[in-house]
Amino acid sequence: MMTLSDLPSDLAEEVLSKIPVTSLRGVRATCKKWNTLSKDRSFTRKHLAQAKAAAAREFMVVMVMDFQVYLMGINLHKDVDATINGQGKLISLDDSNQVDISYVYHCDSLVLCIPKDCARLVVWNPYWGQTLWFKPTSLRHFPHWYMYAIGYQMRRGNRDAKTSRWLLTCRPTTKTITKNTIDHL
């Protein structure tokens, strides 16, 4: 009986090229051969070329439905029927799918999500399917009195992502996410 790890390299590469980029992390854990193949430069170029071609046909939208955050691919081109496909969903680290999100902000492919309870914030990179959860600095007032934003700051040639929070009195507090953090997001 043939196993997944016994597939010829060209067939394994073809199978892996059909897997969304956001799912490659799980593939790497399948077997050593697939892990090595998924890191191969030619495979990476081929996979990214396919993703780029698909991206040319559809655009991505972040949607909030029933307090859940979804990444959706929408294709409205005339050569195919209009389609809306789920591409990703924000979930919590403790595997509970119930992260009730009240507000969503975005900047250059990063999404800042504010849960209803405001106890912690999350920066989500939908392309890579990675998240960074952190607790805001002290909430001395009612949590919903705050406004949030996400952006970048250039420092020493690096583009650091930065989240900001304002109380309605407009006193900003910030959280810097360094380039090293972004590279791992």
From Swiss-Prot:
UniProt xrefs under InterPro entries: F-box-like_dom_sf, F-box_dom, SCF_F-box_component
Top-level taxonomic group: Eukaryota
Where in this chain does the record put each F-box domain? 1-47
Under Pfam families, the record lists: F-box
Official protein name in the record: Putative F-box protein At3g17400
